[in-house]
From Swiss-Prot:
GO terms for cellular component: cell outer membrane; pore complex
Membrane topology summary: Multi-pass membrane protein
Entry text on domains: The C-terminus helps to anchor the porin to the outer membrane.
Protein task: Porin for sucrose uptake.
Keywords: Cell outer membrane, Ion transport, Membrane, Plasmid, Porin, Signal, Sugar transport, Transmembrane, Transmembrane beta strand, Transport
GO terms of biological process kind: monoatomic ion transport
Record's protein name: Sucrose porin
GO molecular function: porin activity
InterPro entries: LamB-type_porin_N_dom (IPR021570)
Subcellular location: Cell outer membrane
Principal subcellular localization: membrane
Amino acid sequence: MYRKSTLAMLIALLTSAASAHAQTDISTIEARLNALEKRLQ
């Protein structure tokens, strides 16, 4: 159960991470997302 602010933060984080890494390390980004989701549950 996410709040809109949390979703916005995740989207911003993903966007910045994707541009920073130029999609060279998608698995690391996914791992970070999974860790964040576990923390938020």
